[in-house]
């Protein structure tokens, strides 16, 4: 996707955990609870000054002793509390003009039934073998197999090309990478507590930071 394309205003949040809710028909739906409270605008970027339109948002809170002077000055200029996360969302110029520095964007930015993309950092698993990391099959348990039960097998060829090709699936670090779940449906919104209940799972551990934005690959309903 073109990085200059307007993706719409989103929210920063925290993954509270998972639970389930019931529909009016009695169906059980697994949902992830996201805390999106106190999203405050720290800067409005305009085409005249910055070359593009965007809204910069801060989330969370951080002790003053843990904020460097540059960040403290930036938040003080906006008149808001320094946060743990700072991110900007590309929006249309008309949408950016509707906000001003210091505004708080509420969960009502979204609506029930809307499709969103949620980005988070997956849980780190440490150093992992090829079976866990790439779902390789293990070798024979017995019948002639000696100490080669979980080996990945050959990783190269012969004298030509005489090297291991880049991208070869091998052992290594698993997890702790940014991943985005696309087209998740908002099942419920708690306006009082500023919570979004999103259908399905979201990357990351409890209390992990997430980015919620309007879906960019919305699928059309069949027959529509």
From Swiss-Prot:
One of its GO terms (molecular function) is structural constituent of ribosome. Pfam families: Ribosomal_L3 (PF00297). One of its GO terms (cellular component) is cytosolic large ribosomal subunit. Disulfide bonds: none annotated. GO terms for biological process: translation. Keywords: Methylation, Ribonucleoprotein, Ribosomal protein, RNA-binding, rRNA-binding. Methylated by PrmB. One of the primary rRNA binding proteins, it binds directly near the 3'-end of the 23S rRNA, where it nucleates assembly of the 50S subunit. Belongs to the universal ribosomal protein uL3 family. This is Large ribosomal subunit protein uL3.
